[in-house]
A protein has these predicted regions:
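PLP-dependent aminotransferase-like
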Residues: 335-392
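Conserved core segment of the aminotransferase class I/II
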Residues: 149-154, 445-487
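Conserved N-terminal catalytic core of the sugar/cofactor nucleotidyltransferase
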Residues: 2-5, 31-102
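Short loop-beta-helix segment that forms the pyridoxal 5′-phosphate
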Residues: 298-299, 310-332
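N-terminal nucleotide-binding beta1-loop-alpha1 segment
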Residues: 1-19
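Active-site pre-lysine segment of PLP-dependent enzymes
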Residues: 118-122, 372-385, 397-461
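Conserved core of the sugar-phosphate nucleotidyltransferase
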Residues: 112-196
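N-terminal "arm"/small-domain region of PLP-dependent enzymes with the aminotransferase-like
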Residues: 241-297, 385
């Protein structure tokens, strides 16, 4: 068994990172892609490893030769790397392909060692590694039958996302038997390159072979094993979070993304609290039915959205504004004072992060078993001279809940002390008590009482970025509205 690595490409989409080096010289977690791949292959007792190089090949060859790889290394240089595609690079290695069984892989991949073992352990002669297609994946896909035979190869331009659950993405790691290479793949490779030219992809040859229905090449499906194809800066950023060996560092890199966790299929999110029962299928169908209109036309402006929000919550549109998620409204509200601001911790940190260190007055509830009442809050802040009090109710992450009677009393206490009270009830729909403070019976109690609510949590639509701010002080709401975008 030998390995052939295609490493001639320029990697233009990686910008400055490939200005003086080819794509496989990019580092992930401090290790270059090519080194990671070669170290894995070096442990598999292969007869040789052949690299087809091109762009910046001197740097690449010098680096590879410095690694001390025990397996024999050979190089083939593609001198026209800037005028050809990977079908030409592979054709340069066609004579080597027919001399031995071959592991074929592309150099812009990062993958765990288990992927290579799966191919080597599988008794079938010729295999393509595939993974279940996900919406962010790019490139050629396959359709498979129940016996893992390749029914069709689907080019990127021909993908139909309504059929996404039927697709398998090629990992771009293959095992070709010598017999398959000599009598099937290489002859078709020669013919296809001659007919179509050198600016094509070697996967097109596999598609032709699949159409013959000889079932010589089958698929080996992955089941959660890690891999990533690195084409651009975003891919590199994701790979950094997937392939770091330091668990704490991995946690930091993933949480710093603040979402997009669908790219981590095994991740279980205990942080972002979203209603798992919404949206309903009927609601999703309505969104899908209107998606063309929603995407291709300008939406209604802020004035209309305020009308709709007021109708939804049963209050005047003058008492409510809508933001790009609650986060946008939180930032604006926290800038309304330069004085001291009271917080009950641990809590949702977006509020704390929006004010200066010297403004923060913290009521730490760790010694209270994270349980506190409205009276506890009054007692603690009575002599603290705060100008604003922030309360998340129910709180996140403690889950502490202050009932409506205590909230009523807290509003009156803040009014007496002339303290601006911000109540975040984004999680109130998860509590036993159904009563919301976004109602005239509460808002009319005090000019400086405001309620913030994230629509994401209760309705299960965090991607829609909707939050509301309600209060009696329409002058301040209008002032904040003027700072926000029209849409």
């Amino acid at each position: 068994m030998q390995a052939i690595i295609l490493a001639a490409g320029m990697g233009k989409r990686l910008g400055e990172l490939t200005k003086n080096n080819t794509k496989c010289m990019v580092e992930v977690d401090g290790v270059r892609l090519i080194e990671r791949a070669l170290r894995i292959l070096d442990r598999k007792n292969l007869n040789r490893i052949i690299l087809v190089v091109g762009y910046q090949h001197e740097n690449l060859m010098a680096f590879v030769n410095s690694l001390g790889i025990q397996t024999q290394i050979g190089f083939i240089i593609n001198e026209v790397y800037d005028k050809s595609n990977n079908i030409f690079s592979l054709s340069l290695a066609k004579e080597q392909m027919i001399e031995d069984d071959t592991l074929l892989l592309e150099s812009d991949l990062i993958f765990e060692e288990r992927l290579i073992d799966m191919l080597l352990e599988d008794k079938r002669d010729s295999l393509a590694l595939v993974d279940k297609f996900e919406s962010w994946m790019d490139g050629t896909c396959m359709l498979l039958d129940e016996n893992d035979c390749i029914v069709d190869m689907v080019a990127k331009k021909n993908l139909h996302f309504v059929n996404a659950d039927q697709y398998y993405k090629t990992v771009n790691i293959y095992k070709f038997s010598r017999h398959f290479s000599k009598y099937t793949y290489v002859p078709f490779l020669k013919a296809y390159a001659m007919a179509m030219g050198n600016n094509e992809y070697y996967e097109s040859v596999i598609r032709l072979i699949a159409m013959l229905d000889t079932k010589e090449l089958q698929a080996r499906r992955l089941n959660g094993q890690r891999w990533y194809e690195i084409d651009d800066i975003q891919d590199l950023d994701i790979a950094e979070s997937l392939f770091t060996d330091n668990t704490e560092e991995q946690y930091k890199k993933i949480t710093a993304r603040y979402g997009g966790f669908w790219r981590y299929p095994k991740l279980v999110d205990y942080c972002y609290l979203v209603n798992p029962y919404f949206p309903t299928e009927h609601m999703l169908e309505e969104i899908r039915a209107n998606s063309d209109r929603l995407i291709m036309q300008y939406p209604s402006g802020a004035r209309v959205i305020r009308l709709l929000a007021g109708k939804l919550f049963g209050i005047s549109d003058k008492k409510i504004i809508v933001g790009n998620g609650a986060a946008e409204l939180i930032r604006e509200m926290m800038q309304e004072t330069n004085g001291k601001i009271g917080f009950v911790t641990p809590t949702f940190e977006e509020y704390i992060n929006c004010c200066k260190q010297e403004q923060r007055v913290i009521m730490d509830t760790r010694k209270m078993d994270f349980s506190y009442s409205g009276q506890d809050i009054q007692d603690y802040f009575e002599q603290k001279h705060i100008q604003m009090l922030v309360l998340i109710n129910p709180d996140n992450p403690s889950g502490n809940y202050i009932d409506s009677r205590e909230i009523y009393e807290l509003i009156h206490w803040c009014k007496k002390k002339k303290i601006c009270l911000i109540l975040d009830e984004s999680f109130s729909d998860f509590s036993d008590e159904a009563e919301s403070c976004i109602a005239d019976s509460y808002l009319e109690l005090y000019d400086e009482f405001y309620v913030i609510k994230s629509i994401s949590k209760s309705y299960g639509v965090p991607g829609c970025r909707l939050g509301i701010l309600a209060g009696r002080n329409s002058e301040k709401l209008d002032q904040i509205q003027r700072k926000l975008p029209i849409w």
